[in-house]
Amino acid sequence: MASLKDMRVRIASTKATQKITKAMQMVAASKLRRAQLAAEAARPYAERMDAVISNIAGAAAGSPGAPVLLAGTGKDQVHLLLVCTGERGLSGAFNSSIVRLARERAFALMNQGKEVKIFCVGRKGYEQLRRNFDRQIVENIELRSVRQLGFVNAEDIAAKVIARFDAGEFDVCTLFYSRFKSVISQIPTAQQIIPLVVEAPAAGAGPAPSYEYEPEEDEILASLLPRNLAVQIFRALLENNASFYGAQMSAMDNATRNAGDMIRKQTLIYNRTRQAMITKELIEIISGAEAI
């Protein structure tokens, strides 16, 4: 059995850990609100831009001059998985859930005889994925030095992806990230971004309105598609940021509660042990006195 001194050290250590987790919870809570507002503000713009491009693409998809980002290469043999995760841990299942979804997709594609390449954004995703896919990882971007995410970060990632696509390195690109729903709910999401998936009109929506474009649809799309790619990546980064702080806040809250439970149990054991030792000493004193 541990000595009373060991028990006191253990209780003090648990209390110190509880203070750290409580502080991390408060920091995550303070950053969550700003991250949540940024993610929610980006959604309408990204969704509307996707809808506008889908509208234009509906008329241009079949034309011979359609941009390759829309029409694709005509094949789906080589798949690039753009996996966006966090730079830090201590956030529950935030990173592992995104990696799990990407890993399942990678294995499914490989079982179909497809070639898989992985582009990692975030240190945690890279560390987990390289255990199974070290040879498939073609690039890794870390954003640890970025104090606040900006559109320029997404543009840089989009430019690298487009450069690889133009070089013929892959046929299909799928973006993986975590969509923020609430503090306790983040949804791992996979979204195909190359070639662009044109949404079919909803049933019963009637014929789509006809527009005339100046310049032609192909020219508009050639300009908008790269920007839309950056917009979708930026949205994913913002969703990830909010999801990370939500998951971290929840994880640290659970850790703080668990530490409190441990402190109560350890204190109870300490008091019982101390009481037993005092009782034993009293019995020994009384027994000695009676013997005299």
From Swiss-Prot:
PROSITE patterns named among the record's database cross-references: ATPASE_GAMMA
One record GO biological process: proton motive force-driven plasma membrane ATP synthesis
Coiled-coil ranges (or none): none
Stored Pfam families: ATP-synt
Record keywords, A-Z: ATP synthesis, Cell inner membrane, Cell membrane, CF(1), Hydrogen ion transport, Ion transport, Membrane, Transport
Main subcellular location of this protein, as a coarse class: membrane
Subcellular location, record wording: Cell inner membrane
Domain of life: Bacteria
Membrane topology summary: Peripheral membrane protein
GO MF annotation list: ATP binding; proton-transporting ATP synthase activity, rotational mechanism
Key word Membrane present: yes
GO cellular component: plasma membrane; proton-transporting ATP synthase complex
Entry keyword annotation includes Cell membrane: yes
Family label: Belongs to the ATPase gamma chain family.
Subunit structure, interactors included: F-type ATPases have 2 components, CF(1) - the catalytic core - and CF(0) - the membrane proton channel. CF(1) has five subunits: alpha(3), beta(3), gamma(1), delta(1), epsilon(1). CF(0) has three main subunits: a, b and c.
Function: Produces ATP from ADP in the presence of a proton gradient across the membrane. The gamma chain is believed to be important in regulating ATPase activity and the flow of protons through the CF(0) complex.
This protein's name: ATP synthase gamma chain
Protein source organism: Rhodopseudomonas palustris (strain BisA53)
